[in-house]
Regions:
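Soluble FAD-dependent oxygen oxidases
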Residues: 1-166
Length: 166
């Protein structure tokens, strides 16, 4: 799935169900990407991840650091290309695709009734977005713990929690 010189950008999101509107968005967006980039997009991937969430949902959101307690279908978008001139387009394409999926979910259920936690996925998010989506409402509590046990930020990789201020 890789070769020398291949450029990639990855971002993940999640939906509650793979509905026809969601699949149509993905089909249209992939067609848009391949039409723009052409044959150079042949290693692009759209992954659907299904996990059993019953055990995860058996604990409430505040019981652990991670806030995601919902039933989700993970979607990882990994466009590929080789020409640097497509870098900006690819990044914008990924973000607009994630936004379109979120919009479709809101149209399907504007109240998001029954949604527990966030749909963020730490391995495919950027910076502070990653931290706040992964920890959600637990982030302020984790900042206090960080202040007490690691104020010097010795452990600052992966999900860098900023210690609470005085």
């Amino acid at each position: 799935m890789t070769e020398h010189g291949l450029r990639r950008y990855m971002k993940s999101t999640a939906v509650r169900k793979l509905t026809v509107p969601v699949l149509q968005i993905l089909l249209d967006k992939v067609a848009e990407f391949t039409a723009h980039v052409g044959p150079d997009s042949y290693f692009s991937v759209c992954l659907y991840e299904y996990f059993a969430f019953a055990k995860i949902r058996s604990r409430n959101e505040e019981a652990t650091a991670f806030n995601n307690r919902g039933d989700w279908v993970g979607i990882s978008l990994i466009p590929s290309w080789t020409k640097p001139e497509y870098d900006g387009f690819a990044r914008d394409w990924v973000h607009s695709t994630v936004d379109a999926l979120a919009d479709a979910e809101r149209k399907d259920d504007p109240t998001e009734e029954g949604v527990v936690g966030k749909r963020g996925y730490g391995n495919g998010s950027d910076g502070l977005e990653k931290v706040t989506q992964v920890f959600g409402a637990n982030y302020p509590r984790l900042r206090k713990i960080k202040k007490k046990y690691d104020p010097e930020l010795l452990f600052r990789k992966w999900f860098p929690i900023v210690p609470a201020e005085d």
